[in-house]
Amino acid sequence: MAKAISLEEIKNETVDLEKIPIEEVFEQLKCTREGLSADEGASRLQIFGPNKLEEKNESKILKFLGFMWNPLSWVMEAAAVMAIALANGDGKPPDWQDFIGIICLLVINSTISFIEENNAGNAAAALMAGLAPKTKVLRDGRWSEQEAAILVPGDIISVKLGDIIPADARLLEGDPLKIDQSALTGESLPVTKNPGDEVFSGSTCKQGELEAVVIATGVHTFFGKAAHLVDSTNNVGHFQKVLTAIGNFCICSIAIGMLVEIIVMYPIQHRKYRDGIDNLLVLLIGGIPIAMPTVLSVTMAIGSHRLSQQGAITKRMTAIEEMAGMDVLCSDKTGTLTLNKLSVDRNLVEVFAKGVDKEYVLLLAARASRVENQDAIDACMVGMLADPKEARAGIREVHFLPFNPVDKRTALTYIDNNNNWHRASKGAPEQILDLCNAKEDVRRKVHSMMDKYAERGLRSLAVARRTVPEKSKESPGGRWEFVGLLPLFDPPRHDSAETIRRALNLGVNVKMITGDQLAIAKETGRRLGMGTNMYPSASLLGQDKDSAIASLPIEELIEKADGFAGVFPEHKYEIVKKLQERKHIVGMTGDGVNDAPALKKADIGIAVADATDAARGASDIVLTEPGLSVIISAVLTSRAIFQRMKNYTIYAVSITIRIVFGFMFIALIWKYDFSAFMVLIIAILNDGTIMTISKDRVKPSPMPDSWKLKEIFATGVVLGGYQALMTVVFFWAMHDTDFFSDKFGVKSLRNSDEEMMSALYLQVSIISQALIFVTRSRSWSFLERPGMLLVIAFMIAQLVATLIAVYANWAFARVKGCGWGWAGVIWLYSIIFYLPLDIMKFAIRYILSGKAWNNLLDNKTAFTTKKDYGKEEREAQWALAQRTLHGLQPPEATNLFNEKNSYRELSEIAEQAKRRAEMARLRELHTLKGHVESVVKLKGLDIETIQQHYTV
């Protein structure tokens, strides 16, 4: 007998619980197969600690200082050093006011970043707590689902298909498990674990179900020890690369401006040393978008919180930008497009065995089901009985074989009242037919019934039985007999059809990926209005392709298909891979352990509600509510978040260009030295205003969106260049002419550099901040209502700027108030030259889209002799495309959507077709039948479904 040791010694690992016999494990851990009591579990938790890895607590001070350690902050810090080190010349003291101002700007920016990120981090931690792994544990003699963190050595847990093992444990009696240990050992194939073997925390159960006794938790597990040996890797994501590219563009623009100033001011113009340094400081301070990392990270954090409120928890923050760009969604049918609430029509049950009625077929199916911890099919089978207890009435359960994706069936070995042994099995018809080694006539009859069911959108479930004369659960038993076929109806969700229509309008192509038969997939697709261009999974391997699509390569077939049927997990992975090769941003939904590779491969892996731990672990977004509508809502929210970030980046690039080139030309042409301190005031007011962009109301992009750096830089350069030019023109009119004095009766500022400084400051401040209203809107800026917070922040900032320009009298900043008359003139000037900004924005977008060149070179629109610019051809192409997409006509070898035809043109044709259909509908209203059908169509009801399932 093993020497008894204390729990403290077990914690210190003085005994090797992995190698000793299982009975000694119970003895050493002072526990039984009945599990621990709740009190004992709580006391052991004090000894062993929670079952999770130690979290590194980052210093708050270091985290705060970290916000000052990035390339954009380095430039500002270099400017601060310049203000006191290099600006100490020409008999003037160091530029302390600019130094203090720069430090204040950095501290303000870091404080806002720290507070917002801390709040977002707390919110994210609360959300992720909801995703904390759960496990089935035996406490006080009852099985219950608990958080894995409460597990202690000695607990009895249940491990089933799809579970991530929550702690190191030894397996108890039962069938062997298949365990995927690739995350720990790198083994690519699942390993077989027999009773008595150890399973490691972090590995995944791929097949089987078994109980186990916990022997190590938290940092004492194999996974916990390994985690201490490796440092976390810092992968640079796409979002970080975009930030770096935009930051580098701004820094390079500033560097070019500074280089030009240095070359012109010192060797050519022979300016004073200190004047040159002051001008360089203006470009450095004003050009750097110091708030960019803060604004973008806060925007993403707030957006992530909003997504969680809609039922989508983001595990990876940058998944938001990928969700905004998603253009293909591969969706499961069961549970996502349908309710996953199955029912059986007793009248359609088909009996194959002699001396058996339909009720016995249902009873046998219920016996081959779980009575607890059920999935949807088990619950349906047991629920069809008058009393669920009948499933185990008069029999004694010997062994239950749970469902696994390979065998696709469940089975129960049981003993009846006469002490005879039997085995019942239910599962996929093909697997059950092979199990029974059915004759050809039986197979033909089964396939015929399956086709009839499928035409009505019904899935098939087969039932078989056999006797076990050897009276042993390991014995093969007698020959399997095919007993019957059951039709399962899984009704579509009430909102699926409308959601799919919304998805198509948003430019997201929804493809149904299902393991069901092709006929079921087509019928579901027809009911949901997503098309009937469905193909069997065999077509992905180049087999069983329809003659109409035989010439299509696999990639093109996947792209054009509305969905695939009879799909296995490896097919899902292949579908995602091929779509990505065609440059699509792909989303994939999944719920099972075998979906994990496809979820990992997809740009956005989406674990649906009630997904297994393995699917959640592989996904980027976890849904807390069922259905497709949650995903589409998340797409819209993601696009709104992305739009805010994109709006800000265009604004940041524009401001850099306008500050750098505006002040550079003024400094070089007129040798006028703008005050670096006043640029600091502009930067501080700008940052305060721009922080509100993270909560701005925006109109999401109507199509999938992504980081188009070419568009961001082009728009920023053009808008910023225009603003710089308007500032230069304003300064010329104020400095060299009496235009404003003559036209508006204000005093001339030509002889007062200090008053000109105030006027120039106000003009730059107004037009710089007003630009955000242009970059935030897709159409005319005055038609899209901004968020109230942004409007209030803008008004406060510009009120402060106007008061400074009117009343300030700061000798250190060379500023003197210019009066209310000039303030009014500057506001009028800014408003007049603000108006063309929208037109320029539209022009840039139009040129970059390529439509301008297409119209000019390809369509020759300006010189065409066709009436209505070839409208008839476009309508014909649209009609052909629609007929093909909905299975009414096979596709031709030629490209259906000629690339010359823009999305907008096709949309216009679609709108015209809708209007004609609406007119026809209104004419139908004159008949009673037409009125009833029209109302039904308007409410989105399916008349055929109503007729099938409801009778009077």
From Swiss-Prot:
Segments on the Cytoplasmic face: 1-64, 118-246, 300-646, 697-712, 776-787, 839-952
Coiled coil: none
Protein name (record): Plasma membrane ATPase 4
Tissues in which the protein is found: Expressed at high levels in root, stem, leaf and flower.
GO annotation, biological process: proton export across plasma membrane
GO terms for MF: ATP binding; ATP hydrolysis activity; metal ion binding; P-type proton-exporting transporter activity
Catalysed reactions listed for this entry: ATP + H2O + H(+)(in) = ADP + phosphate + 2 H(+)(out)
Binding site for Mg(2+): 591, 595
Active-site residues, record numbering mapped to chain: 332 (4-aspartylphosphate intermediate)
TM ranges: 65-84, 97-117, 247-267, 278-299, 647-668, 674-696, 713-733, 755-775, 788-808, 818-838
Keywords: ATP-binding, Cell membrane, Hydrogen ion transport, Ion transport, Magnesium, Membrane, Metal-binding, Nucleotide-binding, Phosphoprotein, Translocase, Transmembrane, Transmembrane helix, Transport
Gene from which this protein is expressed: PMA4
Membrane topology: Multi-pass membrane protein
Extracellular side stretches: 85-96, 268-277, 669-673, 734-754, 809-817
Localization in the cell: Cell membrane
Role this protein plays: The plasma membrane ATPase of plants and fungi is a hydrogen ion pump. The proton gradient it generates drives the active transport of nutrients by H(+)-symport. The resulting external acidification and/or internal alkinization may mediate growth responses.
Family matches, as InterPro entries: ATPase_P-typ_cation-transptr_N, ATPase_P-typ_cyto_dom_N, ATPase_P-typ_P_site, ATPase_P-typ_TM_dom_sf, ATPase_P-typ_transduc_dom_A_sf, HAD-like_sf, HAD_sf, P-type_ATPase_IIIA
Enzyme class per UniProt: translocase
